[in-house]
Structure formats: structure tokens, C-alpha cells
Amino acid sequence: MARRPLVMGNWKLNGSKAFTKELIEGLKAELHDVTGCDVAIAPPVMYLGTAEAALSGCGCNCGGKSVIQLGAQNVDINVKGAFTGDISTEMLKDFGAKYIIIGHSERRTYHKESDEFVAKKFGALKEAGLVPVLCIGESEAENEAGKTEEVCARQIDAVINALGVEAFNGAVIAYEPIWAIGTGKSATPAQAQAVHAFIRGHIAAKSQAVAEQVIIQYGGSVNDANAAELFTQPDIDGALVGGASLKAPAFAVIVKAAAAAKN
């Protein structure tokens, strides 16, 4: 089946109110006529309100609804209560966020988030009607030891074991080899395709229908120079973009490359 690509910008710990407004104005100008590719941005949660306001009334022929959708970089498993500093699914929905990143290697590393905890976040998002963007991927040591497939399977199975394979209906997986994040290194298109094909095949062993529709993004130092070649691969359905998402022209090139390659 034809899968509609998704290119999502993960701003990480970057930005300000002024930066958020300026970048979104640039993105709206660059992307107002793009079709055939879903686009999302995940600013820091402090700036979701600023981003929501900046995205409204985009000035194109879409009836006031921007082609760019809001996302977020994290969520908690609790809906409310005494959980200082955490953000709930309902809070994210209140700002119009749709695509929520979970399991990013930086969360797994710096905040010690386990596969099982990430799976609970996945379940909380599904219950709230939000779209999980599940990040998976191996470290450099695991890659060199030939454990890429083992690691990816384990991280996917944590969700399947907790929620069933059908939980991946309408969900997104982002393969992000840790050794390629923010390093300037990137898997070759063939290397990335091999892992994406494995991920889809691993899910297909449980359900072919679920595997065929799940969006699998690549997320390792994607930029305006390497995106087009990555998107020629049949199992790469878009990108989770870090540094390049902070510059409107570069991010727009990536979005347009996905739209051109997949349509």
C-alpha cells in the first residue's frame, strides 16, 4: 500500500519565543504549497502555545489550517496529579499537538527510560488519540557487534508484548542509529533501507496489514544534502530531523524531497 511520508522536526532544547515565531513564518512561506507529505514540528513544550498561534491563519488556500502540524518531544504516563515537572497527554492535546516523540535515545540515555517505560508512554498516547513516534536504534558499540536487528526487535517487542501488534496501526517508528545522531555521520541509504526492511518484516511476522501501513522514518543526521537519496528507498517513509529542522530552507528541502520521492 502507498504510505504517506512524514517529515518531523525535533527542535530538542533549542529556541525562544522570537525564534519559534520566526522559524514558523519561514516554514509557512517555504511549505505552503507542498502536498503529498505530512509535516510536523516538535518545539520545546514551553513554546507550544507560541507555535500554535504562529501556525494559525497561514495565509494560503488551506482554509486557515497550516500544512504543518504540531508535535512534542516527550510525554508522561500520568494524566494528572502529584508528578512535578511532567507533561500529560491531555496538556499536549490542549495545544493541538498530534505527533509525540517517545523513546528518543537522549531520553533513554540521560533519563534512564527503559523499553518497558517507553511502551507505557506509547499506550498512554494511543489511549489519548495521539500519534506515538517511537524512536528505536542501536549504539555504535551495538552496531559494530552486529546487534542492530536484535536491539530494534527488542525495542519494538516491548510495545507488542504490552499492547499487541495492532497498537502500531496509525503509529510512527523512527529508526535513529545512535551513532549517527548529531555526529554528522549517517547510515548509507542502503544500510538504512536494510534496517527499515527488517523492522517492517519483524512487525509483518505478527501482522502483514499492520506492517504495510506503519510509517518508518529515518532519523540519523538527515539533512538537505542526503535526504533525497534516502527517500528513494522503499521502506523509508520520511525523516525525524534534528539540527536541520532549525533552519527553514534546509527543512523545506527535506520535506520537498520526501514529497517528490513518494508521489
From Swiss-Prot:
UniProtKB keywords: Cytoplasm, Gluconeogenesis, Glycolysis, Isomerase
Catalytic residue positions: H104 (electrophile), E176 (proton acceptor)
Compartments it resides in: Cytoplasm
This protein's pathway: Carbohydrate biosynthesis; gluconeogenesis; Carbohydrate degradation; glycolysis; D-glyceraldehyde 3-phosphate from glycerone phosphate: step 1/1
Binding residues annotated for substrate, in chain numbering: N10, W11, K12, G182, S221, G242, G243
Molecular function via GO: triose-phosphate isomerase activity
GO CC, one annotated term: cytosol
UniProt cross-references to Gene3D superfamilies, sorted A to Z: Aldolase class I
Chief subcellular location: cytoplasm
Enzyme Commission numbers on file: 5.3.1.1
Alphabetical list of PANTHER family matching this protein: TRIOSEPHOSPHATE ISOMERASE (PTHR21139:SF42)
Similarity section: Belongs to the triosephosphate isomerase family.
Name of the protein in question: Triosephosphate isomerase
Species this chain originates from: Haemophilus influenzae (strain PittEE)
Gene name of this polypeptide: tpiA
